[in-house]
Amino acid sequence: MNMISYALLGVILGISGVIYAVYLAVWVLRQDPGNEKMRFISQAIATGARAYLFRQYRTLAVLLVILAVLILVAIDMPRRTFGLTALAFIVGALGSMLAGYLGMYVTTRSASRVAQAAATGGMGKALLVSWRAGAVMGLSLASIALLLISGFYLVFRSVLPDDWAVPLVALGFGASLVTLFMRVGGGIYTKAADLGADLVGKVEAGIPEDDPRNPGVIADNVGDNVGDVAGMAADVYESYIVTVTAAIFLAAILGLPTQFIEAIILFAALALVATFAGVNLLKTTGVKHPLSSISLAIYATIGLSVVLFFIGAFTLGLDSTKALALAATTSLGAVIAPLIVKITDYYTSYNYGPVRKIAEQAKISPATVIITGYGVGLMSAIPVIAVIVAVLGISYMIGYYTVPVSGFGELSKYLAGIFGTAMASVGLLVVAGIIITADSYGPVSDNAGGVVEMAGLPDEVREITDVLDSVGNTTKATTKGYAIASAALAALVLFIALIFEIVYSASKILGKGIVDMISESLSGLQLINANVLIGAFLGVALVYFFSSRTLEAVGRTAMEIVEEIRRQFREKPGILEWKEQPDYARVVDIATRRALGEFLIPGLAAIVLPLITGLLLGWNALAGLIMGAIVAGVPRALLMANAGGAWDNAKKYIEIQGLKKTEMHKAAVIGDTVGDPMKDTVGPSLNPLIKVLNTLSVVFTYVIVSTNIALGIWPSGLLPF
């Protein structure tokens, strides 16, 4: 097969995946939605989620149009790329929106169907419905990403034979930008609604979780979908697009044989084939422990992907050493996915020591719960970082000795190693379909439990949905670790791509050889260069600013929701006596309005700061900013996500021991409340932040380098070195 054939294969499989996702969606929606009350609850959740998403998309549309025009004028017109960079940016953004909407459309309508399946078909049927609802999201994500990458690659190679790589990366920039706002806005919504509903409902009014008398209960369930489904899907979709396009970009700019570009697209296509199989490998008959069935489906998918990588590598026409090296580095990335999931599980599941240690501290006070949980979160970052470092080192060495980079003098071997790390990153991301299937299953089962509670179904039905929900909490927590690790590797690959695009742009503008430009550029990137250090501190500061703004936004929004729920209880005392209907829509509207208002400032900071830094301080200050954001952002995201997950499950561990409404339980609830915005707002929002910084910089590199040269600050930056 030639290069065009592999890209066509990607297009065909991408379309096939979308069709299969639609088939699964139709199957799920044909299931019995239950009685009238169950349908009402499910419809209320779906309506609230759709209203939020559409209002968010309308808000984003203005920013996307402004940036598309800027890219057209500043990038496409000077480089004569026929507007394709702007087009890729818009399509990448629309793809992210579509992936989020498709998955959320099905998951919000699945809750009553899972609840009814639990009532009539037991554990097995309920598990199947919730799993297939999650698979709609997983398959949509992977298929749309593969379709866009393969399709745009075909178009760009045909229209722009010599300058097609940067427009392809713009696909990732569009996806990154939408994801950033979806993660921030969705995270603020979901945790503010959760906090508001719990603080007034459970703590003040003393009513159970998901009680229909709570005016915030629908907003809480809507938040599960806009944050945990649409947000997570957009996050991993973006990482997929960014990593694969950056790897293709590197292969092109390093002048590698076309088989290496073919390998990237081929491996992504083969992983999607494995995902088709994995989605159908879930055992549901006679199952008592759903987590084991889900884990088996994930392991089988990744194992099949690895086998297909090695088989596919030998169809590329490379010698056996290079084929094996490509398959090995990609497989290395794929096999660490379950390892990262397992590490996260160890630190966030109540089956292991760290969470039980937090639960034990609840016997003393909320303060010791928070202190111990924070310590667990700090420690949890270490093994994940160790795995990332090991993968980078091993894949670098494989690439160093096998990838045929030439024409860069003494740097050729070093650059070959860099491509090896890019392939490992590709391996981690192309198995995203099955990981997101497991993640999206979580909110579906969570909402199903809420429907059972609100509809007043029998206790035995609630027991089934509680088991499914417990497994869903585990899959949601562990997927956060995967998303953060994948974001880290994607950001590192993009960072290398950025440096080479800077060199390439300077070479074109100044008319110098690329080898000379590499040597000249690296002199401006030394760690003792003041510009680099200034940029690094700015990157760290951006991470902390971003974390602060999102945390405070949750608090402000939750405060308004709390006041509204209190007002309804005060003005309508019949609500608590089952005599009056709560105004669910009012709370949904508050959460929507405040979340959309709060996400603009941190989002705009992620766009404006790198552009100003690169244009005025110099390209090396921009490089320092990005590296500072990566080094500060990845451990902080792991801390936030895992500490929050550990606090959550410490509370659940106390509950399963029958210790609800004790002082010990109250202490654990406080820890869980503190951890909620950390694990579902701040931590997840840092993933797209570090990728937006990279993709934005790659797309605007030509403008940044041109400005640096015009201002006389190339290559050393504003401060002389």
UniProtKB/Swiss-Prot annotation:
Optimum temperature is 80 degrees Celsius. InterPro entries: PPase-energised_H-pump (IPR004131). Substrate binds at residues 191, 679. It catalyses: diphosphate + H2O + H(+)(in) = 2 phosphate + 2 H(+)(out). Its cofactor is Mg(2+). Its main location: membrane. It holds the Pfam family H_PPase. The record marks 476 as: Important for potassium independence. One of its GO terms (molecular function) is magnesium ion binding. It is a multi-pass membrane protein. Mg(2+) 1 binds at residues 194, 198. One of its GO terms (cellular component) is plasma membrane. This is K(+)-insensitive pyrophosphate-energized proton pump. It comes from Pyrobaculum aerophilum (strain ATCC 51768 / DSM 7523 / JCM 9630 / CIP 104966 / NBRC 100827 / IM2).
